[in-house]
Amino acid sequence: MKNGMLALILAGGQGTRLGKLTQSIAKPAVQFGGRYRIIDFALSNCANSGIHNVGVITQYQPLALNNHIGNGSSWGLDGINSGATILQPYSATEGNRWFQGTSHAIYQNIDYIDSINPEYVLILSGDHIYKMDYDDMLQTHKANMASLTVAVIDVPLKEAGRFGIMNTDTNDRIVEFEEKPANPKSTKASMGIYIFNWQRLRTMLVDAEKNNIDMSDFGQHVIPSYLESGERVYTYNFKGYWKDVGTIESLWEANMEYIGEENALDSRDRSWKIYSKNHIAPPNFITEDAEVKDSLVVDGSFISGKVNHSILSTNVQVRKGAEVKDSFIMSDVIIGEGARITRAIIGEGAVIGDHVVIDGSKDVQVVGYNEVVGVPNED
């Protein structure tokens, strides 16, 4: 390991607030931005930060995620001294069971972590959209001689009650942690990104299990326990773009923010690329009747209608007379002749029949995976 740090991505979340989009796949496997899945951002951050050993902890509906990650080659994680490992719940003689929380998922994978023997473990969520240099966070952790470092981002005070809030002294040492406080004292919100000194965390988790102490969740149990025991716990203050895409509205917003030559994620930054599994598709075909404005259009698309301020993923068809506006269309979608789609997310493989109207002007509308709306035209 280049920097002595193992990354563990928590990717087992169901994401119930995404409704139809997570009925058959885990939230980190949901598509984003035309050619990515949400987990690609955490994996790419690891690759760009020089972290070459990554464990991906799955649980709910893992098949699509497992197929997407494979051996990690798309992120350069398939070398001799590197690897991406899928970690799923299993039954052992000690009675291991389904993960009961974030830190319990780490406890159940102690054998894997010990086989890597890292000095530090980086805990990540697989369902956020952002770019971060984890090595810079590690250097801050070392400089503070911290036992635990928590990445935080400033949020508006009116929104702070939705997050775990860190109250710090003038040196960024955390003196108090409040989970979703009614009257927040700070605007430093936890991003769910942690660096732990592994041996200290390991000891805590093992002792808690032996003594039947609930230490299953980082926010509810581990961080408060660290603070109570006087551990050196600091924040890492992140200033870049970060989006929790846990709701339909936030997922739609993040995709709309991704459109444009100078988007918040700076998608054309060659020094910090976002990698993904490559899918071979033919070139786009845009007919002479088509009209495409201010949109991202990925390979394999066929457009004979109008597309405005939208994202078309791989192999999307927009047939004659159809109009798509302010929408995110996932891969392999067919939009029939004369259909009208506004402020919507259309799931993979969906079919929108001729002259169907999907109007999200009040609330963002969602069509699920392989869902058929209206009567499809077989031509």
Curated annotation (Swiss-Prot):
Keyword DNA damage set for record: no
Annotated keywords: ATP-binding, Carbohydrate metabolism, Glycogen biosynthesis, Glycogen metabolism, Nucleotide-binding, Nucleotidyltransferase, Transferase
Keyword Acetylation: no
SUPFAM superfamilies hit by this protein: Nucleotide-diphospho-sugar transferases, Trimeric LpxA-like enzymes
Family: Belongs to the bacterial/plant glucose-1-phosphate adenylyltransferase family.
Known partners and oligomeric status: Homotetramer.
Cited function: Involved in the biosynthesis of ADP-glucose, a building block required for the elongation reactions to produce glycogen. Catalyzes the reaction between ATP and alpha-D-glucose 1-phosphate (G1P) to produce pyrophosphate and ADP-Glc.
Protein name, as recorded: Glucose-1-phosphate adenylyltransferase
Gene: glgC
